[in-house]
Amino acid sequence: MASRKTILIVIDGLTPSMFEAAIGDGRAPALTFLAENGSYTRAVSTFPSLTPVCLSSLATGGHPDVHHIPHLVWYDRDRARIVEYGSSFAALRAAGMARSILNAIINMNRLHLSPDAVTLYEALDDAGHATAAINITCYRGHTRHLPTLPAVTIPAYGPKRFFFYNLFESDPTGAPLAVFGRRQGSIDGYAAAVGRWLVTRDGFDFLVYYLPDYDFASHAHGPEGAYEALARSDAAVGALLDAAGGPDEFLDRYAVVLCSDHGQTNVERSARLQSAFADVRGVIVTASNRAGMVYRLPECALDTRELAQLLDADGNAETVLFRDGDDVFARRDGEEVRVERDGPLFDYPHGGTRAWAAAHNPNAGDVIVSAAPGVEFADLAGRHHAGGGSHGSLQAGDSEVPMLTVGLGAEPESIVDVAPTILRAFGVEPPPYARTLTHAA
């Protein structure tokens, strides 16, 4: 059993450079304290480097070929319809508001997340440990929770203690509403109130503490323009330290993993990935942020390689992936290479591993597109973050994350290493897919 209880803190979209600057100049005292007492490295996300995909990798210890969450927006072949998790409010509306909200909150965990993937909550609950989560969208566990809204009766199955934007609250904490005033950090403020309540009561063995407001600000202002949001995230982390009686007392009780789910880069212009396939019958294109997918329907006259070749002259697409049987190929600058599962791919961190896994996700498109520098693909409603920040591609800026561990004696190289690291700290054997992870330089 872990000598200390463990908290996984996820600051959505925090880049390594921003984290390093904040702890270097004292603007983030709580993060600085943890960094001074822990081990820090730059780690790598998964691909596409988008929040639902990345949080599923953090929770399961697997890439998308394991957990089956392919993107923020994708085409469900079995049901012949678009699944939209929240590229933008307008995109939710374009895909059907009620169905999209149900997909994002319930069906991602109940239907879309692979039953063969094992979440941290499931594994630790099975081993007799009390689990808790605040606001994270990949939450699948064994405990049934009913919504707080009387008119909504669909349950969620999550960790023992589960708090999700006031919609699911396993305990009455008195926390404020999470959904108003997000520019002022209302969601992180809600997390801080719940986290303080949990720590004060020593109410868990393992907690996921998810802070999304930094990503919201970084999309609006760019990755180097969200210092105020980072200060609020730091205050939310500081609330945990204070609730334990102070920083030293906090570390006496808890081990910590602190990371982000993905990076973020500046975007200068938007593009519609659909434009490259305007004259092609029998395809469905889904895209948002800095990654997109093309689904080939039976009536399409072009094979997947020919679809990928249509993007050779498109300056908005840097690298295009497709499968031929079990083999994965990548096209870049008009040239084609075979992707080795554990090998390098161009200059991308862990490029072969991440590209191979994305292409072997059964819910992924037949063609997967990683955007060119400075480009974002508009979503279903035409929304984008041009002039701000975005993520999703294979590029290092979108893919590298800060990784800080305190009290665990481990330095995860990838976000998929986090779950097995935590499980081993509790003396729980990770699932087989998480034991043989290898990484390319």
Show which residues each predicted segment covers.
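Short, structured active-site-proximal loop/turn typified by the sulfatase FGly-forming signature C/S-X-P-X-R
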Residues: 20-73, 132
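A structural signal for short, well-ordered beta-strand segments and their strand-loop junctions
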Residues: 10, 42-44, 130-136, 206-210, ...
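Metal-dependent active-site segment of extracytoplasmic phospho-/sulfohydrolases and closely related
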Residues: 8, 30, 232-273, 368, ...
